[in-house]
């Protein structure tokens, strides 16, 4: 029964209801998350380091996984002549974007010390700077996971499978809540626990949408074809969409 629900196809109106419910549940859990976070860390150095550390990875995520690739890829998947061509485009985009985001994330990990010390927190004490750098490096695992989630979600959207996309959206806050709870139980973990919760949230999202992809009988494959014209269309549309999302 759960499998049937997870793989069911929905029309536009039903999909809108499902996603609206997911947004509502996530918003309520977000209130719980913020309340617990504030009660645990207040406005001290750990909280300041957490929010500062998230700034650079979140800016990157806005470009690579803020819905831009989903919005760009769905119409091009639907425009393909058959499912074989859909899968080919899907694999090319997955491979190319995965490699590009992995490389950029690695650069972010290497450069974040310079960014924090020189631009983000130049006048803050060394301990807070170091905590911010360490947490930022941990959070740079997110962009690759969320970029893959965005691409897999596009394939599910093109096939009108919204259930697992909604579940993936909901799991974001519970994992962070779990991280805050862990920090309460083991204070030595401090702000690293909710930061790990953020990474766990991205991993959980990837697990759920991957289940949906398996339900389509699609399998992730390495297909390196950077000169494919449809790939260039996806990347251009994604850049335009990301620019719009970031400006909002």
Model-derived segments and spans:
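Membrane-embedded alpha-helical bundles of multi-pass transporters/translocases
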Residues: 1-248
